[in-house]
């Protein structure tokens, strides 16, 4: 994960109400995302993840580019958990609470018995992933694996579930920059 680690060290840190916020191509789409960095992340996920799945699941918005590239690499169909309701048959709503927001998200095209791989850009508070896994459980899907590109060290809402996420790199962030763990 040489490119990923180097890019994390180079990423700008901005202060948002006393919170040191990492601005990174994988987690924010800015600065520009180098295709070699995205490729490195996808190769890392293919090595780390259980790919014996029916579908790849990713939350809107910043999980989409990673999951799309992974879907193309593996030929596993992609389901995006969206922030907008369409009212389609079988649509399931979930409520997510993160460290900085609360919102509804919506799942389509997941059925009882589906084996899924959940992919996301960043695990920080864990609120999004915990809500997604709970909703997938309620549907009857089996979450075979959860893989994130970047994990901020510390407690998360995922810790209160039966799920564990694998990360390609673990970091901490403060006003001085990023530390790789």
UniProtKB/Swiss-Prot annotation:
Keywords: Purine salvage, Transferase
Gene3D superfamilies: 3.40.50.2020
UniProt-listed GO biological process terms: purine ribonucleoside salvage
Domain of life per record: Archaea
A GO MF term: transferase activity
UniProt entry tagged with the keyword Protein biosynthesis: no
EC number(s) on file: 2.4.2.-
Pfam (any one): Pribosyltran
Function: May catalyze a purine salvage reaction, the substrate is unknown.
Protein family (similarity comment): Belongs to the purine/pyrimidine phosphoribosyltransferase family. Archaeal HPRT subfamily.
Database matches in HAMAP family: Hypx_phosphoribosyltr (MF_01467)
Protein name per UniProt: HGPRTase-like protein 2
């Amino acid at each position: 994960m040489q490119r990923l680690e180097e890019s994390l060290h180079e990423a700008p840190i901005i202060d948002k109400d006393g919170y040191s916020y990492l601005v990174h191509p994988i987690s924010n789409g800015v600065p520009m995302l180098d295709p070699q960095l995205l490729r490195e992340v996808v190769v890392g996920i293919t090595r780390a993840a259980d790919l014996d799945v029916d579908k790849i699941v990713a939350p809107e918005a910043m999980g989409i580019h990673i999951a799309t590239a992974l879907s193309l690499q593996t030929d596993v169909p992609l389901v995006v958990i969206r922030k907008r309701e369409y009212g389609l048959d079988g649509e399931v709503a979930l409520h997510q609470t993160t460290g900085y927001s609360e919102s509804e998200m919506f799942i389509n095209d997941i059925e009882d018995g589906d084996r899924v791989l959940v992919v996301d850009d960043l695990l920080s508070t864990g609120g999004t992933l915990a809500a997604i896994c709970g909703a997938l459980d309620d549907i009857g899907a089996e979450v075979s694996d959860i893989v994130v590109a970047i994990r901020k060290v510390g407690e998360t809402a995922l810790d209160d579930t039966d799920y564990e996420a694998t990360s390609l790199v673990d970091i901490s962030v403060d006003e001085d920059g990023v530390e790789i763990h």
